[in-house]
Amino acid sequence: MVKIIMHGCCGHMGQVISDLVEKDTNAEIVAGIDVTDKGNTSYPVFTDIHECKTEADVLIDFSSAKAADALLDYCVERSLPVVLCTTGLSEEQLAKVEETAKKIPVLKSANMSLGINTLMKLIQDAAKVLATAGFDMEIVEKHHRLKLDAPSGTALALADSLNEAMDNQYHYVSDRSQRRQQRDDKEIGISAVRGGTIVGEHEVIFAGTDEVIEFKHTAYSKAIFGKGAIEAAKYLAGKPAGRYDMADVIEG
């Protein structure tokens, strides 16, 4: 039985994960941490992260970027593996994640779904053929009107996958409104749509002369992210210090 601390337990994803874990015979949430104790939980909730002394095997984080620094310090102090699902981290925070991974196991993924992580592999193979042949690469992401960050962490992760396949020769453009020039050959455009209750949609476009190839992933429920986070927590518990991602979970 893997014992989990849920950081951001009163948020939507925290509640989704709590519901899923209740039905999981191999995992248990033993404590929650959130700025407000407004969730419907069967476990104790702490509004101050340092007040949580509950013994656990791993922590799952679905909170906000502003809480990331204190969270990482807390996990290092307790030698607690962390599944970091929060997006919108600054460059300084991303650097801190890498430093933290030298001390404890850290699994960071912008998107926890099996489908998205499979898509990342597919588009890398496509990029090696199509981008090399001169196809332009664009990403369009769509999310609900309440999402705070743009582009989404998943869109940036998809862009990173494309760029990695092309030896990091590309740069990203997410705003063309102030530019009066044609598209650069070595850019990956990223466009964001916000509206309604869209859970998450990501489209990767390879646009060539007289032909277009599109890869698309649509999330109909946030439960897919919760399931992935739980599987990641089970995988990470007991692992040595290091930087992990969902590819490690998928490969076992």
Where are these regions (language model features)?
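Extreme N-terminal starter segment of soluble prokaryotic enzymes
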Residues: 1-5
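Rossmann-like NAD(P)H-binding beta-loop-alpha module
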Residues: 118-134, 150
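C-terminal substrate-binding/catalytic lobe of Rossmann-fold NAD(P)-dependent oxidoreductases
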Residues: 7, 12-50, 132-252
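Rossmann-fold NAD(P)-binding glycine/threonine-rich loop
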Residues: 73, 77, 86-106, 117, ...
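An anion/phosphate-binding loop that grips the pyrophosphate of nucleotide cofactors and donors
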Residues: 56
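Rossmann-fold dehydrogenase core element
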Residues: 81, 96-113, 130, 135-136
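Hydrophobic beta-strand scaffold residues
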Residues: 29, 45, 82-83, 106-108
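N-terminal Rossmann-like NAD(P) cofactor-binding module of classical short-chain dehydrogenase/reductase
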Residues: 59-60
